[in-house]
Every structure is written in structure tokens, then in C-alpha cells.
Amino acid sequence: MSKLEELLAELCPDGVEYVELCDVAHYAKRRIDAREVDESTYVGVENLLQNKMGKTSASTVPATGNVIAFEKGNILIGNLRPYLRKIWLADCNGGTNGDVLAIQINDDNKVSPQFLYYVLSSEQFFAYDAQNSKGAKMPRGDKTAVMKYIIPVPPLPVQ
């Protein structure tokens, strides 16, 4: 039993609802001009740190075109080589590219960003993501499968 399962059993003895990720969150789609981001607010897969260690400043930032906008509280996951376990809970607004999944919560009154980050930074999630990835040399996570990942949704005070 995982630590999360132990806590849920202790704090929610009557059980909790389990839903697919897509029921509580979605991928960011809004685009912004690349000129709106800089080294501290642009997040590419190369500056997400392995083993759930957050991010570092970008060494290169797109000079032209559009990037996918993310907001403070979004969860960014590296979609290339999911076994590297690259994930970050955004502490600012910024932009990213298609190699990073920017997950936005649909309703902050149902799921807190910190709780969702905790669930998605679990070894169970990364094993699921790696199992559903495609490709041999540079596997990519399956965006559809990620949204089908089953997560617990305890009451907000428990989260």
C-alpha cells in the first residue's frame, strides 16, 4: 500500500471518489507570443530536472513563434523519456513547448494543485506513463493515456 493510500484510508474511512485525470484537469492550449517569456519563465523538457527535482532556468528561449501558456499552479511534466520523472509545480506564469505537458486543473474547489502534483509525482504515475509510452530510443508519453490515469479525489480539507 502506498503512503497516499495509507493516508486516504486513515483520513477518509468511508472511501474517496476515484476519477480519470481528464475529469478534473486538461492540457493547457492557450498560446502566447514567444517574446513574452524569458529564461526564467520558459520551460522546455531540457530544463525540467530529472527525478522530480523541479526546473532550472532555460539556456535557450524561442525568439519567434508561439509557445503554450501555463499558469502558476499548473503541473508541467516532461513528455520525452517519461522514465526520467521530470515534473514541476509551476510557481509562476510562463510558456512551454509540445514536449512538456502543462496540466491545468478544471476546478480548484475540487482538486488542489499541490495534491494533484503529489499524485502525479508518484512512482505509480511514472510507471504508468512509461508503460504507456511509445518509441524505443526517445519514448514519448501517450497524452491520451495520461488523461485516463485514475486518481483519488478526497475532500479538499484532506488534500
Q: What function would you assign to each model-found segment?
A:
Residues 24-32, 41-72, 91:
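Sequence-specific dsDNA recognition surfaces
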Residues 34-42, 131-132:
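Short coil/turn segments at secondary-structure boundaries
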Residues 80, 95-101, 134-157:
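A short glycine-rich beta-alpha junction/loop motif
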Residues 66-68, 72-123, 140:
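A short beta-sheet element
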Residues 4-5, 29-33, 50-51, 111, ...:
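Short loop/beta submotifs within extracellular cysteine-rich repeat domains
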Residues 3, 7-32, 156:
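Non-catalytic DNA-recognition/assembly elements of restriction-modification systems
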